[in-house]
Amino acid sequence: MRPEPGGCCCRRPLRANGCVKNGEVRNGYVRSSTATAAAAGQIHHVTENGGLYKRPFNEVFEETPMLVAVLTYVGYGVLTLFGYLRDFLRHWRIEKCHHATEREEQKDFVSLYQDFENFYTRNLYMRIRDNWNRPICSVPGARVDIMERQSHDYNWSFKYTGNIIKGVINMGSYNYLGFARNTGSCQEAAAEVLKEYGAGVCSTRQEIGNLDKHEELEKLVARFLGVEAAMTYGMGFATNSMNIPALVGKGCLILSDELNHASLVLGARLSGATIRIFKHNNMQSLEKLLKDAIVYGQPRTRRPWKKILILVEGIYSMEGSIVRLPEVIALKKKYKAYLYLDEAHSIGALGPSGRGVVDYFGLDPEDVDVMMGTFTKSFGASGGYIGGKKALIDYLRTHSHSAVYATSMSPPVMEQIITSMKCIMGQDGTSLGKECVQQLAENTKYFRRRLKEMGFIIYGNEDSPVVPLMLYMPAKIGAFGREMLKRNVGVVVVGFPATPIIESRARFCLSAAHTKEILDTALKEIDEVGDLLQLKYSRRRLVPLLDRPFDETTYEETED
């Protein structure tokens, strides 16, 4: 699933020889430019880009140790050799498990998959398939109940045992602010709306599916974002994939970060616009593409582009990195381009008021032309939104496929969003929303800091609630997920093709619902599994100078 020349996908490229622009590499340790400035004592609003930041911007990607990279490639090589051996044994009917053998009646069918994808699925993915699609039978809160299952045919099929694994610490759900629960004011309000309006609308917004709740929600979203108007949609993925084609088309240019989500990739490809990819969060790469676009224009004709649209995300969900929004906005203004910001993971999770990456950097929402986000994460609901100028929203109401053809959002879902958003804004008469935002920030710093102290390689920004812990080797993907579940901790493990082939990882998502006791329990188990599987690859560790309170951030870097 590597991207085509005009495409991109949600993963980070390999760093050749540890060379990274916008940052510095020393002893294989990669730090962003602002983190380097902070280490040198320039900790207030100073970057290499002219002081665009109003706060320190600390983002770290430690380079893969050479020995680990070699052993990872060797691991994949051994698995590949055994895969070919198993294919040989299947061909001659020697292997007992025949699930991967093509049936006689399908011999002449056209292949559904490419050879490598098929080989990878049956010989590598199947070995660790039990780590995914685990069914839960409770609210995805700080703890979940998981249905136990077993496989007697090497993970080709599963049978439920009837047992429930109760009270598993949930480190995988996008429940950033803890609103995914079945009790409380949000749920009570949603239940009342369900009684009054029912579960569904059974129509589109343009017909008879436009409820007063839709109008109330869109006005509230616009106030929350600080924009003129907003429009909501029933599906977050479709908010991107169906609206980008309405904004750009042939004769337009899309500049997309190489790690953008699949929904942005699909929307860009469906639009028919020309697509160019810039290196992840690399402003030199983006500026070069902008300059080339203006100087050379469209291919063959050399006519000016009708529009140039920059696509970025607030928080990148596989890397835990935060977009360099001040620099992106500066380039956008300099070269007269448009900016499309996907805040699926950052809205509610970043900023002193929970208003996302724009709030996090203290920027003006009017500097972002198209503000997109979802309600599936911080708000504990479903759907998405687009915010911006009123003229933009009026245009999308008549030209967006999601607006014209999709069924309207469910009333109880809207009420969940309305109630939780008012809570974040403090309009419910309590400080609960603000406390949740602060608690998430504290949990994030604490969890990241403790993992680094243990010696794990952790990617991303220190303020990002998405925390990737690097596993690297394919065998350790399955082993880590299984060992953590044995210890009553549910985690998400990720490998190729969602990541580069040697950068498999576990991804933790922090929540305001996590108490310090829950985090300490999870960290204790992670530490034990890290020792068991020898996952502590970092050559630099953070060591506490003193025993400090929960929210302190002063730590010393040491090198092994």
Swiss-Prot record:
Component of the serine palmitoyltransferase multisubunit enzyme (SPT) that catalyzes the initial and rate-limiting step in sphingolipid biosynthesis by condensing L-serine and activated acyl-CoA (most commonly palmitoyl-CoA) to form long-chain bases. The SPT complex is composed of SPTLC1, SPTLC2 or SPTLC3 and SPTSSA or SPTSSB. Within this complex, the heterodimer consisting of SPTLC1 and SPTLC2/SPTLC3 forms the catalytic core. The composition of the serine palmitoyltransferase (SPT) complex determines the substrate preference. Keywords: Acyltransferase, Endoplasmic reticulum, Lipid metabolism, Membrane, Pyridoxal phosphate, Sphingolipid metabolism, Transferase, Transmembrane, Transmembrane helix. Its EC number is 2.3.1.50. Component of the serine palmitoyltransferase (SPT) complex, which is composed of SPTLC1, SPTLC2 or SPTLC3 and SPTSSA or SPTSSB. The heterodimer consisting of SPTLC1 and SPTLC2/SPTLC3 forms the catalytic core of the enzyme, while SPTSSA or SPTSSB subunits determine substrate specificity. SPT also interacts with ORMDL proteins, especially ORMDL3, which negatively regulate SPT activity in the presence of ceramides. Forms dimers of heterodimers with SPTLC1. It is a single-pass membrane protein. The lineage of its organism: Eukaryota, Metazoa, Chordata, Craniata, Vertebrata. The modification N6-(pyridoxal phosphate)lysine is found at K377. The gene is SPTLC2. This is Serine palmitoyltransferase 2. Its cofactor is pyridoxal 5'-phosphate. The chain crosses the membrane at residues 65-85. Pfam families: Aminotran_1_2 (PF00155). Its main location: endoplasmic reticulum. Pathway: Lipid metabolism; sphingolipid metabolism.
